[in-house]
């Protein structure tokens, strides 16, 4: 199992190829590829490479799936005995990022098997049973 720890949006995140992650807003158009070069750690076949602070020559390639807003967080401030109340809401802008491959020193150490980022659906035949119409 190959994985990497990246830094994006001021947070550190463990990523694996073939999975999507919700990260801070990246100002990139949806359905385009994006490369993250702030890789802190790379693990492949029980070999761990730790950067100081970043791993040289390591990148994480992925696709921006969509942008959306997170759940609303309510901030309520009240001063007792002063009749002062403030109610504010905040919704964080989020980007859904699909990890396609982890590159280390020019070679791909982790990638999706089929190379596609959109899930495929299987064709399923629906069997219908014909019943007799009985009138009562």
From Swiss-Prot:
The keyword Membrane does not apply. GO terms for biological process: translation. PROSITE patterns: RIBOSOMAL_L21. Coiled coil: none annotated. The keyword Acyltransferase does not apply. It comes from the Bacteria. GO terms for molecular function: rRNA binding; structural constituent of ribosome. Signal peptide: none annotated. Pfam families: Ribosomal_L21p. HAMAP family: Ribosomal_bL21. This protein binds to 23S rRNA in the presence of protein L20. This is Large ribosomal subunit protein bL21. It comes from Gloeothece citriformis (strain PCC 7424) (Cyanothece sp. (strain PCC 7424)). The lineage of its organism: Bacteria, Bacillati, Cyanobacteriota, Cyanophyceae, Oscillatoriophycideae.
């Amino acid at each position: 199992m190959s994985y990497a720890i990246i830094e994006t949006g001021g947070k550190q995140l463990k990523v694996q190829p073939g999975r999507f992650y919700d990260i801070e807003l990246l100002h990139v158009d949806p359905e385009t590829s994006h490369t993250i070069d702030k890789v802190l750690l790379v693990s492949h076949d029980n070999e761990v490479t730790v950067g100081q602070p970043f791993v040289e020559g390591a990148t994480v390639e992925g696709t921006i799936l969509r942008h959306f807003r997170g759940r609303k967080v309510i901030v309520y401030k009240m001063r007792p005995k002063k009749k002062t109340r403030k109610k504010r809401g905040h919704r964080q802008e989020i980007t859904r990022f699909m990890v396609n491959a982890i590159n280390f020193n020019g070679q791909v150490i982790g990638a999706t098997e089929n190379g596609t980022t959109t899930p495929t659906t299987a064709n399923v035949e629906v069997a219908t049973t014909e019943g007799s119409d009985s009138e009562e």
